[in-house]
Amino acid sequence: AGDIEAGKAKAAVCAACHGQNGISQVPIYPNLAGQKEQYLVAALKAYKAGQRQGGQAPVMQGQATALSDADIANLAAYYASLPADGQG
């Protein structure tokens, strides 16, 4: 499991598209708050490996490439810890 506080510190870049509290204001960008931790890890690793296509995949591949495995685990832990409704 990742470090929630370390993930929070790294999340500023993510917030530009996915919202400050993990709730996106832009319909084409998914909410990250409340997502399952293992799903987020798998998704980021797939982007990093170039295994996801379509939509915003080129943007996410660029973002994920800059992340270490520890960064991915920490970001996933942070977003999984947030309430899915954006409250709290």
Swiss-Prot record:
GO molecular function: electron transfer activity; heme binding; metal ion binding
Subcellular location: Periplasm
Pfam family, one: Cytochrom_C
Protein origin, superkingdom: Bacteria
SUPFAM superfamilies: Cytochrome c
InterPro entries tied to this protein: Cyt_c-like_dom, Cyt_c-like_dom_sf, Cytochrome_c_Oxidase_Subunit
Main localization category: periplasm
Family: Belongs to the cytochrome c family.
Function: Electron donor for periplasmic nitrate reductase.
Name of the featured protein: Cytochrome c-552
